[in-house]
Amino acid sequence: MAENPENENNYSASNIQVLEGLEAVRKRPAMYIGDISEKGLHHLINETVDNSIDEAMAGYCQNIEVTINEDNSITVEDDGRGIPVDMHEKLHKSALEVVMTVLHAGGKFDKGSYKVSGGLHGVGVSCVNALSTHMKSQVFRDGKIYQQEYEKGKPLYPVKVVGETDKTGTRQQFWPDPEIFTTTVYQWAIVARRMRELAYLNAGIKITLSDLRPDPETGKTRTEVFHAKDGLKEFVRYVDRHRQHLFDDVIYLKTEKQNIPIEVAVMYNTDYTENIHSYVNNINTIEGGTHLQGFRAALTRTLKTYADNDPQISKQLEKAKIEITGEDFREVLTAVISIKVAEPQFEGQTKTKLGNSEVSGAVQQAVGEALTDYLEEHPNEAKMICNKVILAATARVAARKARESVQRKNVMSGGGLPGKLADCSNKDPKDCEIFLVEGDSAGGSAKQGRDRYTQAILPLRGKILNVEKVQRHRVFEAESVMNIIQSIGVRFGVEGEGDFEANTDKLRYDKIIIMTDADVDGSHIDTLIMTLFYRYMPKVIEQGHLYIATPPLYKCTYKKVSEYCYTEQQRQAFIDKYANGVEDAKAIHTQRYKGLGEMNPEQLWETTMDPKTRLLKQVTIENAADADEIFSMLMGDDVEPRREFIEKNATYANIDA
């Protein structure tokens, strides 16, 4: 837990600083929460919980309860000090009302209240209030319960005392505005992922997540408690749980350099993929930044120095005629980096890349010292790491040769496109899209049904490579991978970039759409292809080019009325509407589509390919990471969690266990 310094305990209205008003939030919500779809909706929870986490980081809060209520409202309660309720000097209002109704108002802007804090651009809980039809704020402080309610950000009455209490803390309940958001239904998995993450990043804090909406099948509600006594040590084990470890130790450090608290946990495994998660003030810095640069520099320098000074390892390198690079040292590990910065400078509006220059040196020094000590104290593990690094370097050289072979054939290098590709006639990438279609028969229907001017088709024949289980050179030798790379125009080894950094400057299509059967095998192939892009071409995902098509599961017909149903719920709604909920084969004809090949070209166009009517799911780094994690488990070496997952998710994973 964080320190609880005496001089910071006087948390009152004088600590609440006001930077600007709330007016623009409802007019342009996406500017403040990213978007108004599912992601933005869930950010309302994150923003509210961040206030509680700030209290925890300052040393005043140990328990946070997050509840998804039956009506899809959210309640967040903590046992911190409670938002101040005394009068604000400048605004002559209760500090609680200021925090709840003024953008950029809060203790996080006053250094005496919080040394560091998270929160989306610091917009605070007032942003949540502005985007909710109704919100109720209760503060437990000084033996009293203070309360104020709001509609669309406006107070319904002044802050008032509604009871007495012997506890301290804050309880917030809000109802997201359906006029603002495209959906107001919260997803357990998304909320749970973030709560789990926060518990790992803040050792000792207990976060209880409850969902009071009865499960449609069992009728039960659910609760899960997230509590990590060992913080990042547990986090890195959790992230790496489906991989085979090189040795069981977690290399761990927790220190402070240049007034920057730094915490790092590292595990080595038998994979050939770099897996680094970095955080600043609890914010996932997906694009990395100066803290990641410092970590990588320390890793390369320290391990290279160790290898150069070890006669046995030096001899191995000389014999293999290989020069080790920084990426060889990183390919064999999973790491979690968490730092706290008082005034973080984030590049871009999404807080995904740290720009503070002073951080790099601090992290480099901390990691260099800790890793040097570990290697000296653990010579056997050090040799295991270096031997694995040599294997990674050997695989890298083989992969470069394989990649250069692909590059020679690549259209951007003057070669031809794959013979299976049915390209579109439009040559402006902004207007073009390519469908990666499972199987030749479906590929044939797609070729006939498409808009030939803007839509290209690449049938994927045979087995899609499981990139999680093979060395890198095998990936670049695989025909299915080669066909995708050639077709979409991704290039590797561009001058000035890393050997295996995917360059998308000459991407041939704006949308790359994975189109597979609407069954478990199709989901399996979706996951394989998503993992390929996540591991080897992440820029395609980051830039918003990767999508998944949604073919229908059923065609339901009642007399002359026909509807395509994409979910079981839509099919049931059709039955409810036309047959009073009774599935009568005489009244309603249901055609089940087991595969894309069962639809004729017109049906495939109408249901899955027509931009005016189709449903596309955009792949983000977050859901690609989920796919990667699922695949690490399904195709990993540990049988038991795989069996358990398949038993729980039989509709998703049709794989031999």
Please provide the spans of the model-predicted regions.
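Helical (often loop-to-helix) elements that flank the catalytic cores of nucleotide-handling enzymes
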Residues: 89, 347-360, 564-570, 574-578
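C-terminal interaction appendages of subunits in large macromolecular complexes
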Residues: 394-413, 428-433, 444, 448-450, ...
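A short glycine-centered beta->alpha linker in the GHKL/HATPase_c
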Residues: 82-87
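Short adenine-binding "F-helix/F-box" segment of the Bergerat
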Residues: 88-89, 96
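GHKL-family ATPase ATP-binding module
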Residues: 1-15, 22, 44-46, 54-56, ...
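Conserved short strand/loop->alpha-helix "switch" segment adjacent to the catalytic nucleotide/phosphoryl-transfer site
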Residues: 27-45
